[in-house]
Amino acid sequence: MEANTRSTGRLPAAFLTPGSSSFMDFLSEHQPEILPGNRQLPPTQGVIEAPHGTTIVATTFPGGVVLAGDRRATMGNVIAQRDIEKVFPADEYSAVGIAGTAGLAVEMVKLFQLELEHFEKVEGATLSLEGKANRLSTMIRSNLAMAMQGLAVVPLFAGYDVDREKGRIFSYDVTGGRSEEHGYASTGSGSIFARGAMKKLYRDDLTEQQATTLVIQALYDAADDDSATGGPDVARRIYPIVTVITEDGFRRLTDEESSEIARAILERRLEQPDGPRAALL
């Protein structure tokens, strides 16, 4: 795409030549230097300090899936940002939540969104949910060199499978390894605490309202034990981002909806600081 086309007003030939339905393949052929996996960092001593996103959680319910994230980004032992957004729509029926190096993760999400949009425009149809999960896996794998230098991206992907008519969740490791999770999942620094909370609260017959309450309960428990995870911040009116994906598509809860659930949880926590108690039998 080096040819000067400004004088003629024409698009470069690369844009007019039939090719792959993958936007990443297009970039690899014509501008490979802008792909994340082709960037090389100079040798460094120690860990590179960069803002990191922390905890993402997801749970399924009959009819869909809920994906949510806290709002805190940390850099070492410092709170780098209190209102970062970590959950994004991938397309109409899927979403991705980011944990790991925030800047690289957001860039990866934007590239993923372009990948899905490009495929739909070229093929005239959307990728299956499995196909989307596989494309994201490839992107994560391409970031492995950066991950080895401490700049890992480990997202959580969730969506509504229009073929199977149910919500599904996919988790990843830094090498791009993909696993389908059943019922609930979490990633990030507070994931072990969030997962423990969801393990005790999850059940197969959750309503959408109960599922959104469950993920905020899990994020609250994660923030209670993990300093890198931010809980509901009533003073600053900062609440977790909660998204719901059903047969009607992607929907993000409004700040009013999220705050209403968070405030109800906080009110109950005044009586039970450790949260709801599961039955012993």
Swiss-Prot record:
SUPFAM superfamilies: N-terminal nucleophile aminohydrolases (Ntn hydrolases). Gene3D superfamilies: Glutamine Phosphoribosylpyrophosphate, subunit 1, domain 1 (3.60.20.10). The keyword Hydrolase applies. GO terms for molecular function: threonine-type endopeptidase activity. It is an enzyme of class 3 (hydrolase). Pathway: Protein degradation; proteasomal Pup-dependent pathway. The formation of the proteasomal ATPase ARC-20S proteasome complex, likely via the docking of the C-termini of ARC into the intersubunit pockets in the alpha-rings, may trigger opening of the gate for substrate entry. Interconversion between the open-gate and close-gate conformations leads to a dynamic regulation of the 20S proteasome proteolysis activity. Keywords: Autocatalytic cleavage, Cytoplasm, Hydrolase, Protease, Proteasome, Threonine protease, Zymogen. Pfam families: Proteasome (PF00227). PROSITE patterns: PROTEASOME_BETA_2 (PS51476). Its EC number is 3.4.25.1. GO terms for biological process: modification-dependent protein catabolic process; proteasomal protein catabolic process. Its main location: cytoplasm. Residues 1-53 form a propeptide. The keyword Protease applies. The active site is at 54 (nucleophile). The 20S proteasome core is composed of 14 alpha and 14 beta subunits that assemble into four stacked heptameric rings, resulting in a barrel-shaped structure. The two inner rings, each composed of seven catalytic beta subunits, are sandwiched by two outer rings, each composed of seven alpha subunits. The catalytic chamber with the active sites is on the inside of the barrel. Has a gated structure, the ends of the cylinder being occluded by the N-termini of the alpha-subunits. Is capped by the proteasome-associated ATPase, ARC. Belongs to the peptidase T1B family. Component of the proteasome core, a large protease complex with broad specificity involved in protein degradation. This is Proteasome subunit beta 2. The lineage of its organism: Bacteria, Bacillati, Actinomycetota, Actinomycetes, Kitasatosporales. The gene is prcB2.
